[in-house]
Curated annotation (Swiss-Prot):
Residues recorded as bearing Phosphothreonine in the entry: T58, T315
Subunit structure: Efficient DNA binding requires dimerization with another bHLH protein. Binds DNA as a heterodimer with MAX. Interacts with TAF1C and SPAG9. Interacts with PARP10. Interacts with KDM5A and KDM5B. Interacts (when phosphorylated at Thr-58 and Ser-62) with FBXW7. Interacts with PIM2. Interacts with RIOX1. The heterodimer MYC:MAX interacts with ABI1; the interaction may enhance MYC:MAX transcriptional activity. Interacts with TRIM6. Interacts with NPM1; the binary complex is recruited to the promoter of MYC target genes and enhances their transcription. Interacts with NUP205.
Segments of skewed composition (Basic and acidic residues): 266-278, 315-331
Principal place of residence: nucleus
Residue span(s) of domain bHLH: 354-406
Record GO cellular component, one term: nucleolus
Function: Transcription factor that binds DNA in a non-specific manner, yet also specifically recognizes the core sequence 5'-CAC[GA]TG-3'. Activates the transcription of growth-related genes. Binds to the VEGFA promoter, promoting VEGFA production and subsequent sprouting angiogenesis. Regulator of somatic reprogramming, controls self-renewal of embryonic stem cells. Functions with TAF6L to activate target gene expression through RNA polymerase II pause release.
Organism: Tadarida brasiliensis (Brazilian free-tailed bat)
SMART domains (alphabetical): HLH
Glycan attachment points: T58
Official protein name in the record: Myc proto-oncogene protein
Phosphoserine: residues carrying this PTM: S6, S62, S71, S81, S151, S293, S314, S329, S344, S347, S348
GO terms, molecular function: DNA-binding transcription factor activity, RNA polymerase II-specific; E-box binding; protein dimerization activity; protein-containing complex binding
Residue window of motif 9aaTAD: 100-108
C-alpha cells in the first residue's frame, strides 16, 4: 500500500497556523472591536469592568511539524520496505517528507510534546529531570530521543550527498539505517554519567556500547539484523534478539514504559560504579544475585507481651479454697490485660482497680458467710426457729438468753450429779457393812 496517497503536497505549518480554533462567548459580537473600544474609553456602568482585562481564550499553539522532525517513528520508517514508497511515486520526496508521512500515519508525536532538545548539548546530561530520582523513569525516554535525533542527523547528512534516484532496493536502505543506528548508539548518553547507582536490576538502563564495539559494527550482519528488528536497547544479551519478532515504535514505547516503572518507596541495593558497569555489560550471560546490603529496610514486629518490672509486688492473701479458683482466674485475666498495657502510664491505675475489685469480692463473701451464721444461730433458738424475718439483734439477744439458761441448767444438773454420787457412795458403804455382819 503506498504511503503517499494523501500526503503528497501538504504543508503542515500552514494547516496548523491557518486553522487555529478561537472560542467566543457570542458568535455575533466582534471581540476585537469591543476590546479596542474598551481600551480607549472607560466601561459603562452596566458593563462588566473585568471585560476590559479579558484576554483572547485561545489554546496553546501546537509545535511546528517542521521544527520537530525527531519523531520516534523514524525507526518504523526504516523497518518497512522502501519498494512501496518507490513504486507509489515516493522517489520525488526528500527524507524529511517521508518522515513526516510516517509520523502522520503512526501518530507518533510524543517527542514533540515532551522532549525537544539537542543531544549534543551539555545541558541535556545535566538536566534536573534526569538527575532527579523521582523522574528517573524518563532517562530511558531521553536516551531514546537522543538515539532518534542522532539517526535523523545522520540521515540528513547522507540524504544531502545522495542522488535523487531511489531505485536501489531494500538492501541499500537497510544498510543506511543500520549505519544511522550505530551512529545513534555511539552518541547516546551513558547512564553511568547520570546515575552513579542503579535504580533496579530490571529497569536500570545498560551502558551503551562504544563505537568500536563489535556488537553494533556494520560488519556483523546477524547482530545488525537483530538490532533492526528491535531497535531499542534491551537488558538481555544481544544474541537472543535474533528470535524476537519486529515490533512497531508505539508498541515498544508502551513496553518500555511498563518495564521502567520504579518503586520509589523501596530502598534498593547500592553498588559502586565499577561493579555496576561490569555487571551491566552486554557480555554478562546471567544476572548474579545481589549481595545483602544493610541499607535494606525491613519491618519487624516487637512483642508487647512483656513483664512490667516497675510494677509494685502484689500482696496475696490466703483465701478459702472455694473462692480461690475464681480469684486466680480473675488475676490471670488481669495480668494479661496489664501486660498488654505495660507501655501505657495507666498500669498503676489498673492494678488499683484490680485490688479494689478483689476487696469487694472478699467483703461480699464475708457478708454472705455472716448471714449464713445468723441463720444457723436462729435455727438453734427455740423461740426464733420458725421466724425467718427475725432481725440480727433479736437473734443475738435471744441467743444470749438461751445460752445463759442452758448454762444455769447445766450447773443445776452438775450439782445434782454430785449429790447422786455421794448418795451412791453412802449406799455402797452401808451394803458393805451388812455383808460383814451377816458373815
Amino acid at each position: 500500500m503506498p504511503l503517499n496517497v494523501s500526503f503528497a503536497n501538504r504543508n503542515y505549518d500552514l494547516d496548523y497556523d491557518s486553522m487555529q480554533p478561537y472560542f467566543f462567548c457570542d458568535e455575533e459580537e466582534n471581540f476585537y472591536h469591543q476590546q479596542q473600544q474598551s481600551e480607549l474609553q472607560p466601561p459603562a456602568p452596566s458593563e462588566d469592568i473585568w471585560k476590559k482585562f479579558e484576554l483572547l481564550p485561545t489554546p496553546p499553539l501546537s509545535p511546528s511539524r517542521r521544527s520537530g522532525l525527531c519523531s520516534p517513528s523514524y525507526v518504523a520508517f526504516a523497518s518497512f520496505s522502501p519498494r512501496d514508497v518507490d513504486d507509489g511515486g515516493g522517489g520525488s520526496f526528500s527524507t524529511a517528507d517521508q518522515l513526516e508521512m510516517v509520523t502522520e500515519l503512526l501518530g507518533g508525536d510524543m517527542v514533540n510534546q515532551s522532549f525537544i532538545c539537542d543531544p549534543d548539548d551539555e545541558t541535556f546530561i545535566k538536566n534536573i529531570i534526569i538527575q532527579d530520582c523521582m523522574w528517573s523513569g524518563f532517562s530511558a525516554a531521553a536516551k531514546l530521543v537522543s538515539e532518534k535525533l542522532a539517526s535523523y542527523q545522520a540521515a540528513r547528512k547522507d540524504g544531502g550527498g545522495r542522488s535523487p534516484a531511489r531505485g536501489q532496493g531494500a538492501c541499500s536502505t537497510s544498510s543506511l539505517y543500520l549505519q544511522d543506528l550505530s551512529a545513534a548508539v555511539s552518541e547516546c548518553i551513558d547512564p553511568s554519567v547520570v546515575f552513579p547507582y542503579p535504580l533496579n536490576d530490571s529497569s536500570s538502563p545498560k551502558p551503551c556500547a562504544s563505537p568500536d564495539s563489535t556488537a553494533f559494527s556494520p560488519s556483523s550482519d546477524s547482530l545488525l539484523s537483530s538490532a533492526a528488528s528491535s531497535p531499542r536497547a534491551s537488558p538481555e544479551p544481544l544474541a537472543l534478539h535474533e528470535e524476537t519478532p519486529p515490533t512497531t515504535s508505539s508498541d515498544s514505547e508502551e513496553e518500555q514504559e511498563d518495564e521502567e516503572e520504579i518503586d520509589v518507596v523501596s530502598v534498593e541495593k547500592r553498588q559502586p560504579p565499577a561493579k555496576r558497569s561490569e555487571s551491566g555489560s552486554p557480555s554478562a550471560g546471567s544476572h548474579s544475585k545481589p549481595p545483602h546490603s544493610p541499607l535494606v529496610l525491613k519491618r519487624c514486629h516487637v512483642s508487647t507481651h512483656q513483664h512490667n518490672y516497675a510494677a509494685p509486688p502484689s500482696t496475696r492473701k490466703d483465701y478459702p479454697p472455694t473462692k480461690r479458683a475464681k480469684l486466680d482466674s480473675g488475676r490471670v485475666l488481669k495480668q494479661i490485660s496489664n501486660n498488654r498495657k505495660c507501655a501505657s502510664p495507666r498500669s498503676s491505675d489498673s492494678e488499683e482497680n484490680d485490688k479494689r475489685r478483689t476487696h469487694n469480692v472478699l467483703e461480699r463473701q464475708r457478708r454472705n458467710e455472716l448471714k449464713r451464721s445468723f441463720f444457723a444461730l436462729r435455727d438453734q433458738i427455740p423461740e426464733l426457729e420458725n421466724n425467718e424475718k427475725a432481725p440480727k439483734v433479736v437473734i443475738l439477744k435471744k441467743a444470749t438468753a438461751y445460752i445463759l439458761a442452758i448454762q444455769a441448767e447445766e450447773q443445776k444438773l452438775i450439782s445434782e450429779k454430785d449429790l447422786l454420787r455421794k448418795r451412791r457412795e453412802q449406799l455402797k458403804h452401808k451394803l458393805e457393812q451388812l455383808r460383814n455382819s451377816c458373815a
